[in-house]
């Protein structure tokens, strides 16, 4: 092992790999789910503010926009097209520098524009002028640019603004991959072109018991795109077949697929919506209540409860360390021979450089026939290399190369 300049600890983890456990649960909330809408808007606002700060001042000023609330509206969907009678209310809050050298920076204008642009792309049937109200109450802050630049020179590596930890793991299990790829396919541009009636509010739940997997899909169907029950059932069948194709591409286990199981034909209950999201009908959403940074909710795995979306990409370890842990775990799983599973946990200490965590814990389950002794050094080197280049994550975020939900 190399001299441990950083506090990186690589050890063997003694536990049953997830793929061999009897029961596995996996969930993904699609991009149109109210919680995902909150995450998406929070992150879009943070990235827009970051880019505008750089454009005007050459540096990202302090902000955290991870407090977004989606308050459900009220709608009357019906086959052929219904109506939204009470709009969805979206509250943008958090904090951002608004006064720079005694001049106003347009925080609210940038934030609302970013939120509208995100919604336009994320929820196709949402009428931004009639179906939603966006209210920015982002708190104010002021800054002296000279002081900011001097601090940046003194600390080229940002200092952690919190004592917090991030968690990542790799590789994904078969069930995790199926859940993730199912939602991505159903919300892909290609699938929407063929089946425009499928809304963006798609929740996929996976349950594996032994060698049998149940995939339950709740997909909001857009009422204006289905004229009757025949159309509705045709859309459900298309969802079923698409999910079946995904499952068959990732496993040889038996897979059962269920679509919109709350439908009750005798009572005339079907999952139709005006906009493609349940937020129109009273379902609320909050940042951090949904997917982790790898896009999944995985109770069989180590997880952090930090909300990554909307946190600033410079010094907020609640965002940076979760992404970093995932990237380190992915590289170890892909590049180091003999790794069955790897879990990475990184803990910061407030006020310390983010490339010097209090600990970076790498736990590895070796494959049968392999020893942790041959895995420790390359795993350490991968973790150390990422910490050396930690500011790269900020660039990757602003280039939209990393998702946070």
UniProtKB/Swiss-Prot annotation:
Q: Which UniProt keywords apply?
A: ATP-binding, Magnesium, Nucleotide-binding, One-carbon metabolism, Transferase
Q: Where does this protein have coiled-coil stretches?
A: none
Which InterPro entries does this chain map to? AdoMet_synthase_2_family, AdoMet_synthase_3, S-AdoMet_synthetase_arc
The beginning of the lineage is:
Archaea, Methanobacteriati, Methanobacteriota, Thermococci, Thermococcales
* Source species of the chain: Thermococcus onnurineus (strain NA1)
Query: Any keyword Membrane?
Result: no
* EC number assigned by the record: 2.5.1.6
Query: Which domain of life, per UniProt?
Result: Archaea
| Record protein name field | S-adenosylmethionine synthase
Enzyme superclass (EC)? transferase
